[in-house]
């Protein structure tokens, strides 16, 4: 005997045998795809970008002065600069400028683009280093070993944080940092590894050319990369690679 569905005054359906009738099949909604995290860059307010760029470049200049005044060893790029100066007899400023231009040529295959931050890098840092050295020479005319160690280590940390700050503003990296970000983008290697490889390579070339070398140079070469990597978590929400 077939079950026939009959209506109920209470608003639900039953069959002639008293069993509840099967409800109409419900159409299941298609699952909504969850957004992929990290698929789009995190936007940074333009004011913050400008302030972060400026503070990062000022900090970079101060950190450079701290390393130079420490007497414990020059930074890797400074070792290379000094080596070329010793071999060629050219003025230090011209060597720095020439290396910067050569490094920017390497941007072409890496598809890096200069920006306002690239120009600001050259201007601001050069304007900050000399006044910072003037202040340090008056506060610590001849730093003893403990003070020199503090300046070298503090300069390494400050330079790493400052690098993450002005590169993270994504207004255009400096010549040397553009090389770093370009290699990170092309190789997929972490920032700390690319930064360390670059610094070690530059140190070796500088020493071979006769540049000054010290323990602080080694600490800087191996330590600044991890500092940049950690600081970038807060100062570079969109990452250190790519374009604005």
Describe the function of each predicted region.
Residues 2-6:
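Extreme N-terminal basic, low-complexity initiation segments
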Residues 9, 14-244:
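Core subunits and conserved enzymes of cellular information-processing
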